[in-house]
Amino acid sequence: MPTISVHEEDLIEKLGEKIEEEKLNDICFEFGIEIDDVEYKGEKKIYKIEVPANRYDLVCVEGLCRALKSFIGKYENVSYALLTNSEEACVKEKHFMRVDESVDERRSYVVSAVLKNVKMNENVYNNIIELQEKLHHNLGKKRILLAIGIHDYDKINFPVAYKFEEKEKINFIPLNETQNVNGNNFINFYQDNINLKSYLKIISDFEKFPVIVDAGGQILSLPPIINCDYTKITYDTRNLFIECTAIDRNKAEIAVNIICSMLSEYCTPKYSIHSFFVQYDKNHKAEKGNGYLYPVFKNKTLTCHMDYVRKLSGILNLSVKDVEPLLKKMMITSKVIDSSTFTVDVPFYRSDIMHFCDIVEDIAIAYGYGNIVSEKIEIAKKNSLSACTELFRNVLAECTYTEVMTNALLSKRENYDCMLRKHRSYDDRKINLDEYNPLAPPVQIMNSKTSEYEIVRTSLIVNMLKFVSANKHRELPLRFFEIGDVSYTTYDRTDTNAVNKRYLSVIFADKFTAGLEEAHGMLETVLKEFQLFSDYKIEEKSKENVAIRSDVFYKLVPKEDPSFLNERVVDIVLCPHNLKFGIMGIIHPKVLENFSIDIPVSVIEINIETIMDVLMM
């Protein structure tokens, strides 16, 4: 957890009142932070305050005081002004940076901005340095992910450039040094420096070093190690140039957003920021000539439901109208949609808010954890999906089927080509998330190291066929089943753009019969445990005057599927809801050949969650 230094005089100035230490300690505790220590430097009182590691907006005095001020009810309407906020305006002011094609994936990205007319003094100077270092340590993972350089704008000859330069061509005077250092000697020069030696390993194996240079050829910084001495900021600096190089563009944008949003309170006009344009070379490996205007002050909107808020927070008497003043204390604006729904406008500097649960956490903090009425907790209640899974498992085991557990990852070729299938488009909004969807677009593994593990499975059948292939030499018939999760993408219909579903797959293989009758019998057996019967079984029992459940039932609907023999495959449809929750059939010989299987195979696969959701209505 990062700890920041807050001078009492800064606290008084920014909060607009003097708060005694005991009261401040209570406020911090309620807000979810802690006064770790109190130090004195002469007559100056300094609070050491520990803040959450994911709240990058609180790692500076400006952000912390702004948040506490709002929390105690002193609301301030902060409105940021982005000046020169277009590519044309930036080019006119020479506020742009060219990224050379030599810049590779080891430090691919750069984000920049300009702050002008900064009212600099000793406290502001120290706050800038501390904010920079806290972002380096936490967000930047000790400069591995990103490194920030803050320069005296007036000493720079714009525009600037970012490139990887040959070591022998690098010559500059580093920060707080008096002698010129060449790139060939750079590592040796700093290997005994107690503050910088731990960062040298980041670039020690680079053939070329990353540098940012101005139009006059002056090296401004050699990230992620050090800036030049010529552009260092002092108490007399009035204009700031901020640059952040990174291997993750999103994190670099977060860092620059935090710096600009916090330090712009010292600018004239207040909260004004000058935009900066970054243009990548057309041969740049990652960006291919893209251009970006920074900083990106873009809020995001989330829609929340009161049932979820009450369930997660435990505040059972909370109404939708109570939410707005609570979130206002946390500097988040909200809007009521109806009696059960509201939207929130998440500030761009709150990168920690990624899900509805983060909004609920802020509501609970504003409400006060001490004000939430405790309830007796029900311990060791079995999850309904787990209970359902266990029931299926027991039934199949009693029917002499052996359970297997296979990998959740596999190759695209196996999941689709070997099954003679093609997945649906990633932007297909017609996919019903409540149904059985083996053709849904898969979740892909980024930068997969092996072709065997490229995607997350969308069906259990593929790995079951691989398992049969590996065990075809054993005594026949083979009876296996697997209960496991599949995943597929959802195109903006869920907060993670993907969904997990619990599937059951049953496979039967024998030399003398395809086993479709056996598979059909197993389907009836497992669904009977849920009092779920087929339409023909209900009709048959009614003729015998035997009462069985008939309000919910399933029927087998013939279909065509290239993975199965024609006229030997059916959809399993849940009625009267008309939800397809599974498939049953005999695997096509071509598919069996693809998996090196030389005996007939029948399979069942069902979406357990579809059944469970309907029966629990």
Swiss-Prot record:
Binding of Mg(2+), residues: 352, 358, 361-362
Q: Name one GO molecular function term.
A: phenylalanine-tRNA ligase activity
Reactions catalysed according to its record = tRNA(Phe) + L-phenylalanine + ATP = L-phenylalanyl-tRNA(Phe) + AMP + diphosphate + H(+)
The record, for Gene3D superfamilies, names:
3.30.56.10, Bira Bifunctional Protein, Domain 2 (3.30.930.10), Phenylalanyl-trna Synthetase, Chain B, domain 3 (3.50.40.10)
Q: How is its activity regulated?
A: Inhibited by bicyclic azetidine BRD1389, which competes for L-phenylalanine.
E.C. number(s) listed in UniProt: 6.1.1.20
**Entry keywords, A to Z:** Aminoacyl-tRNA synthetase, ATP-binding, Cytoplasm, Ligase, Magnesium, Metal-binding, Nucleotide-binding, Protein biosynthesis
GO BP? phenylalanyl-tRNA aminoacylation; protein heterotetramerization
Domain B5 per the UniProt entry, residue ranges:
297-374
Pfam family name, one:
B5
GO CC annotations on file: cytoplasm; cytosol; phenylalanine-tRNA ligase complex
Q: How does it assemble?
A: Heterotetramer; dimer of two heterodimers formed by alpha and beta subunits.
Q: Which PANTHER family does this entry report, sorted A to Z? A: PHENYLALANINE--TRNA LIGASE BETA SUBUNIT, PHENYLALANYL-TRNA SYNTHETASE BETA CHAIN AND LEUCINE-RICH REPEAT-CONTAINING PROTEIN 47
Q: What is this protein called?
A: Phenylalanine--tRNA ligase beta subunit
What is the organism lineage in this UniProt record? Eukaryota, Sar, Alveolata, Apicomplexa, Aconoidasida
